[in-house]
Amino acid sequence: QHRRFDTSLDELNGLLAYIDDDGQWHGYDIKPRYANVAWDHSIEVELIAETTNIVPGETIWLGLRLDPAEHWHTYWKMGGDSGEPTSANEWTAPEGTNIGELLWPSPHWLPFYDTDLVNFAYEQEVLHPIAVTIPSDYEGDTVELSTLAYWNVCEQICIPGEQRLSITLPVAQSLELDVGNAQIFATAREQLPITDHDIKSIIAVAGERVSLGFEASAAVF
């Protein structure tokens, strides 16, 4: 189970020390760095990039990848009758960086254990894409992007997790696709809900009864 890392520790120096075969003591100052992945028996959570680098002024895509263990699941932005959605907040990035919201692939309809309750969830690996654009006048050689990720992973019980994740990318003049991550980003985009359509929802309320309908100019499915 992952809990918030005390950010005050960012300012502390660690020490790696050893004594060599001649009895001489050696010490190295060590500063803490955040990893890009967190895991336990129920889930693996990772911050990844679609590209191997970043170009000032151009939009790249990061992704928060969640891979629950068998029989476990995470939640959509509206979890349903139980559960809480994944989030990525408290970003640290160069001043002027534009960071978009998490995008949400379409979830599964998940009944809750012999009850009338229903959840909207992901029972397998899911990637939440995030658009990131650093300022066009950025002059550094590398960029570190860090976020506080929160998730809720459930089987018959739910385990909340929270971990600061970080990724560092070199600055370049042209973007280069990370072939190892290309498929998971492509799959995530295929599963995103279609936003450009003319479907209208119609809701009617009569007492305790609610009716929901949809209207479109042509057959949709």
What are these regions (language model features)?
Residues Q1-F221:
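Extracellular/lumen-exposed scaffold segments
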